[in-house]
Amino acid sequence: MLTLGLESSCDETACALVDANAKIVANVVFSQQDHVSYGGIVPELASRAHLQVFPSVVQSALKESGVSLEDIDLFAVTHTPGLIGALAIGVNFAKGLAVGCQKPIIGVNHVEAHLYAAYMEASSVEFPALGLVVSGAHTAIFLMEDPLTYKLIGKSRDDAIGETFDKVARFLGLPYPGGALIEKLAVHGCESSYPFSPSKVPGYDLSFSGLKTAVLYAIKGNNSNHRTPLPELSESQKNNISASFQKAAFTSVAQKLPNIVKKFSCRSLLVGGGVANNKYFQSLLKNTLDLPLYFPSSKLCTDNAAMIAGLGRELFLSEKITSGITPCARYQWESASVSLSPLP
């Protein structure tokens, strides 16, 4: 069984193929560069770019795997959550391919695919497992009974951790996206230079808006307001702020996990999302938890279609399918309580 996956939830246009053994045989990602000058994603530009490059991205994936569309047995596409226009482009393109090839199609949840990405590359995972999604748009903690069954334990009440990194990068005068740049600067900084505190939200939820504001005041001064311009910072200041902020942000997440592991007798940890690629974060989690940890490779941390194809294949084989696939911008947290949220 050969599954072709498509991803277009934000600014990456991606196509991948996964074979009958869940092995990735092609993984092509086109990253849009037009948004850099705007300091963030412009939804209309993203949608137009998806429309323009999807045909060539699919052709590249087929060429890489040495197959044709007629060889595809199943199509999988991201249908939620994400930018509604971008999702609509991907869903309609995938539907056209499926109808033309007279093959089945299945919708995949982008957040749940991030959770599945680490499982794809793991040799064996012991369950129940703790699942952690840390990306630019979502931050959430799940209890996983198996790869397709889980419940939501906690999530960010405001900004996602990746979004917070990008906003702090903007405060520092760094280009978008800024998460990887902060990680690089932090290596040369002192993480105790600024007394940024980790989140103190009770329970298993998270919050990053307070930390973001603390960084802003550390840069502009406590008596500043929204009209106060951002000052020029020295290289050492940028390094120290990056290191101190990074420590506080990741400690906010890591400090929640030991109690969850103990309460639910978790036997492993699966981490997904672009922020999972941060080496400081990986090291912190390894030092915090005494259990097997699974991170996706760099190519599967960021948005990609391999995780969409992989999870789509699992869902299809498990018969977790409904008749319709409709783009939906928001993640339905309330549906993540027993099993994978039903496809609309």
Curated annotation (Swiss-Prot):
It catalyses: L-threonylcarbamoyladenylate + adenosine(37) in tRNA = N(6)-L-threonylcarbamoyladenosine(37) in tRNA + AMP + H(+). Substrate binds at V133, V134, S135, G136, A137, D166, G179, N278. GO terms for biological process: tRNA threonylcarbamoyladenosine modification. Keywords: Acyltransferase, Cytoplasm, Iron, Metal-binding, Transferase, tRNA processing. Gene3D superfamilies: 3.30.420.40. The keyword Transferase applies. Its cofactor is Fe(2+). Fe cation binds at H110, H114, D303. GO terms for molecular function: iron ion binding; N(6)-L-threonylcarbamoyladenine synthase activity. It is found in: Cytoplasm. CDD domains: ASKHA_NBD_TsaD_bac (cd24133). InterPro entries: ATPase_NBD, Gcp-like_dom, KAE1/TsaD, TsaD. One of its GO terms (cellular component) is cytoplasm. Binds 1 Fe(2+) ion per subunit. Its EC number is 2.3.1.234. Its main location: cytoplasm. It is an enzyme of class 2 (transferase). The keyword RNA-binding does not apply. Belongs to the KAE1 / TsaD family. Required for the formation of a threonylcarbamoyl group on adenosine at position 37 (t(6)A37) in tRNAs that read codons beginning with adenine. Is involved in the transfer of the threonylcarbamoyl moiety of threonylcarbamoyl-AMP (TC-AMP) to the N6 group of A37, together with TsaE and TsaB. TsaD likely plays a direct catalytic role in this reaction. HAMAP family: TsaD. This is tRNA N6-adenosine threonylcarbamoyltransferase. It comes from Chlamydia abortus (strain DSM 27085 / S26/3) (Chlamydophila abortus).
